[in-house]
Amino acid sequence: MKKCLYILLVAATVLPFFACQNNDDETATSNPFDVLSVCNNKERNKIVVISDLHLGNDRAYSENVHHLGRLVQFLNEVRTSTSVKELVLGGDIFDEWYVPTRTETYGSGTQADFIRKSVTTNQAVFDVLNRIIREGNIKLTYIPGNHDMGFTAEQVDIALPGVNQARDSSEKYAIGTYHPDGYPQIAIEHGHRYDFFCAMTPNANEDDAPGAFMPPGYFFARIAANSFTNPTTKEASTKVPAVMLNNPGDPEQFSKHLYYTLWQTVMEHVIYVNDAFDEPIIKTNVGKYTKTYAINDILPYNAADGSIQTNLYNNLFTQSNWDDRERYNNVPVMTAINQAIDGSLKT
């Protein structure tokens, strides 16, 4: 019998990997995971990977609301399968980022309370996941993503007691790569460590938030959520102020302008903002950030001398800083900063 590996796209954010044995003896069942003709369905040999569930704790603005019933059905299909041996949660299972700008993320509670409320809001989903853990037939593994990078292993364990967690280390708990048992050639991770907007940013804003590592993508997600709860049209939306590249020969200035063009493209063609950019609306109290910021604090601008500056993340835009940031995120192969900035719009 020849060992083989099959990759099948089940849904937009569901990527099951099937490690199986060729066998002509098929067992017909009603479970969709147990009727694949390429596999020997008499043994547990499939690894199912899902990600980006974005299970928020308030259905007024959570990204995943309308398809929760189908998700529960899918998870029960995994749970009752006789051929699935592992379910991997590949990041962004929780969502601490997609919260409207004027909303206190934790309300009057704590980060642990946020997890508890996320479970309550999505109780049927977590009931199935925890049943998978308790029954012990299928291994359940969790990998952090960018939208849930701020949660420690102990906090995730509140929602999923006993879940296997794949993290680079206790210090760098925001990233993780998982190699399933017996398949070292398979590497499963969320991928945010490679993304300029989403990789951890240590020492980026020490004056404002000492010890913080939340990247620029966090603030983008807050603005995006606010554009959903406070919508406007493209024509009526607040426009991004023009920023001129006055010194194109300066690599740092060029990178800052490229960063600006991404914000301009997104905020004029993807999400439409109905707020004044100088109004302090982004309440934080998350990840060692404590201030309330304006959108202008995130966007690049021309200083009095014509140079491009940013109030937050101003030191990120050199190749040297990007190299250091990649190393901090345990990236094995360095990339060019402008390629990384431009690539963020395509991921």
Describe the function of each predicted region:
Residues 22-347:
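Extended recognition/assembly regions associated with phosphoester-bond processing machinery
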Residues 16-19:
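C-terminal motif of bacterial Sec signal peptides marking the signal peptidase cleavage site
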Residues 2-10:
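Sec-dependent signal peptide recognition
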Residues 1-2, 21-22:
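Generic cytosolic/nucleocytoplasmic N-terminal low-complexity/intrinsically disordered segments
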